[in-house]
Design a protein with these regions (language model features):
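Core hydrophobic alpha-helical transmembrane segments of single-pass membrane proteins
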Residues: 12-16
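C-terminal motif of bacterial Sec signal peptides marking the signal peptidase cleavage site
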Residues: 18-20
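N-terminal module-boundary/linker segments of secreted carbohydrate-active enzymes
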Residues: 25-96, 101-108
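Substrate-binding cleft of extracellular glycoside hydrolase catalytic domains
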Residues: 96, 100-187
Length: 187
């Protein structure tokens, strides 16, 4: 009997969660707040993303054009493209180590290459997302170091590493500002 109740409860939660994800078509406060800051490209992206649930899904692949099974750094190459005939709709790249002013990311990919592939994906009509696994500013170890529970407090205003964290954010912002087409369109 308990097993049956657990199954029913799990099913109810799943249905409630799926219902919460259904598009309502209503504008949220955030939509109207940023309307004046949107570029034409941003509006186009948002409109296209809103259509996705009615048309299918978007498949993504991290570092897709940078390395794959048995290859690394080849131009115009992608495992997804080799299998499916086209690049994935979504690509992602990690900006970890940009805060350390390194030439390459924590995935050993040159930031200049990430920049170029971001522009290429934009030109193909695809979506790019970024992660940033920054090093632990408190311990100096990698992003997965959780040995000190005060790391978040150390980067907040008044924290011992707040200024360092702000400079790291500035490095990410500077990189993001370099993402533009030859015509000057910001990506």
């Amino acid at each position: 009997m308990i097993k049956r109740i657990k199954i029913l409860a799990t099913g109810a939660l799943l249905l409630a969660g799926l219902g919460a994800c259904s598009p309502s078509g209503k504008k949220t406060g955030a939509d109207s707040t940023v309307d004046t800051l949107r570029t034409a490209e941003t509006v186009n992206l948002l409109n296209n993303l809103r259509k996705v649930p009615t048309q299918g899904i978007m498949f993504g692949h991290h570092d897709d054009p940078l390395y794959g099974v048995g290859w690394e750094g080849d131009e115009d190459r992608s495992d997804v493209k080799s299998v499916c005939g086209d690049y994935p709709a979504v690509m992602s790249f990690d900006l970890g180590h940009i805060e350390l002013e390194r030439e390459k990311s924590l995935d050993n990919v040159p930031f200049r290459k990430i920049r170029q592939e971001t522009i290429n994906q934009y030109k193909r009509g695809g979506v790019v997302s970024f992660s940033w696994h920054l090093d632990n500013p408190l311990t100096g170890k990698d992003a997965w170091d959780v040995s000190d529970t005060t790391v978040v407090a150390s980067i907040l205003p008044g924290g011992v590493h707040h200024a360092k964290f702000i400079s790291w954010l500035d490095a990410v912002a500077a990189f993001m500002n370099t993402l533009e087409t030859e015509e000057g369109t910001k990506i």
